[in-house]
Amino acid sequence: MKIRIISEIKELYSIKDDWDDLYSKADYSTFQSFEFNYYSWLTELSKAKGNQLCVILLTTNERACAILPLYIDFKKRLRFINDKHADFCDVLSNEKFDFEDILSEIRKHFKLYSVHFINLTEDSFLYALYKKKVWKNSLLKSFEKYSTLNLDKGTFPYNVLKYTSKQKTEFRRIKKKSAENTHHFLLKDNSNFPIQDIYQLKERMIGLGLRKANFLNEDRLILLKELYNSNRMIVSMVKSKSNICAISFILRNTNEYLFWIDMYDNSKMINIYNYISFIERISQENNTKINFGRGVYDYKVTNFKPDIKQLFAFYIFSNKLQLLIFLFVDNIKEILKSIYKKIKR
């Protein structure tokens, strides 16, 4: 098995076919797709001082057998590309490999202080890798949570057996309240990327104080447009006459749909109405899995009753002192979060 480090954007584009081939052979999320990683690096991460592209390509008999979509940040931490905004992180691989060999190769070329792999599911390659081996100066810890809802083909919400009559009535009430609105289901095949609608709603959200001024900057919009144009993303939109009330950017992977980024104004329950309208439409066609993404928000849990699952983070440090410092700082952060939650109540 040969290890190749991709450190330049031109090199990265040159392995697109290998990447697409590996991606097609397993049930990866959109966050492991070439488009997400390439445009995340090109439009955002490459512009930040101190970041170094460090994608790993493993080959056996001249054929790609694994890709690790990584970079090194200004603190010399090895991370997944765009891990802050990727709900799920993982490698693409159809063969086992020794991660220690990869780390050794990276250290021959770049200074590296630690490894920070976040947003790992229990069935991710790297979670399994950690469980099979004792790693010196390492840590596996619970990270955030995510939630999913499986639906049989049929009419929502009646195709979700666990919903009570009261819950179904509540869905009908929300739909009735927004009856004057129209729902739009946008794909590359039927509509151009709705950039002007996005700008309009973005400005309204900022004006209403619902988002900060840097929300959905131009670099992020380029990434969204590329995902849309590569058919990896759907736009679910709600209009009220000439006004855009809600937009959801939904990542698609066969019959699984992930609500990634939501936009909405101050119309009551408008984001929930957008969710209901999309789920209603998509589950009429096939058995469907809805992924509500990373972060367990009360309004999603209360309304949709999804299954909640745990994400994990895997860290490796250069020495024991680094590990102890990380644990100390992490504990302080948890204490401050706990105090903040109590104050908010």
How would you name each of these model-derived features?
Residues I3-N61, C65-L78, L120-E144, G154-N266:
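A conserved beta-strand-loop-helix scaffold within acyl/acetyltransferase catalytic domains
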Residues L112-L120:
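Divalent metal-dependent hydrolysis catalytic cores, especially in the metallo-beta-lactamase
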Residues I5, I9, Y130-N159, I234, ...:
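Active-site/acyl-donor-binding loops of N-acyltransferases
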Residues N119-E122, R294-V296:
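Short, well-ordered beta-to-alpha junction loops that form the rim of enzyme active sites
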Residues F97, D101-R107, R211-F326:
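Aromatic (often tryptophan-rich) hydrophobic motifs at membrane interfaces
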Residues D83-F110:
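A gly/proline- and charged-residue-enriched helix-loop-helix capping module
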Residues M1, D87-C89, H183:
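Short amphipathic alpha-helical segments
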